[in-house]
Amino acid sequence: MVLKSYAKINLSLSINRKLSNGLHEIQSIYCLVDLYDSITIKKNKKEVIDDISFTGTHSKHISKLNNSVRKSLNLLRKNGLITDYYSVRINKKIPVFAGFGGGSSNAVSLINYLTKNKINKNFFDKMNNELGSDLRLFYHNRGFLKNLKTIKKINKSYNLYFLLAYPSIKCSTKEVYSKVKKYTKKQDYLNKNFKKKDDFINYLKNCKNDLQSIVEKKYPKIKNLLKDISDRKGCYFSRMTGSGSACYGVFSNENSSKAALKKLRKKYP
């Protein structure tokens, strides 16, 4: 069986406060994009062990012993949801340490497949506590993360054209969040009434990623890349996703995004 494990991007990301456990409460409008890892999975009938390997451009920085796939399989067995062991091959097309959530997406894709999309709230909470709080994002193609435990699905869909850029910088999520000093007041996205795509785009233009200025300060290359993207014809706005370092631009149409990509590839070979 081959699974597609999609990347996410944060269309907005606001840091609301720091919790007593050291985590930060955030809000985010997000969506999944057409960038994915391919996961090939089959039962390992010869050995009582999981055989996990990663291939592809972005595989070399992933630990074979300490990764989201292995942790997911162990958690499923620990909770009696599976008993078998598996051979899993992941072709990594999603950059790591980039803000795309590739590891979390891999975990959710695997868990959904092995449980046939049937998990109870108790396991769902364990999964998010032990594997990562952003796993819940991958249960909707798009949504509004209201707080660390609540996601509101966005039912209305718009055709958005993205240019994705990875500047080959590995950002530490822990380090980036440790430098947060200012907080943004909570908002309720669902109170907004967007009658058409332009209204939604204009709203997003006025949003931001609170972590972006922190990362730009350490890596000026990211600030320059974002400006290069936003200066391209047809670009509504550019932004960093998650805690970086990946950036994106939202374009008015596919041709504009492809033309921008062609020019950026010449500047950033």
Where does each model-flagged region fall?
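Short secondary-structure junctions
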Residues: 79-84, 231-235, 266-269
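Conserved, helical-rich catalytic subdomain that frames metal- and/or nucleotide-binding sites
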Residues: 50-54, 138-237, 252-265
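Phosphate-handling active-site elements
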Residues: 78-87, 113-131, 253-264
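Short hydrophobic/aromatic beta-strand micro-patches
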Residues: 248-250
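DPxDG-like acidic metal-binding loop motif
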Residues: 98-124, 137
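ATP-binding N-lobe of GHMP and related small-molecule kinases
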Residues: 1-98, 116-122, 166-169
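Glycine-rich beta-strand-to-loop/alpha-helix junction loops that act as flexible
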Residues: 100-103, 240-245
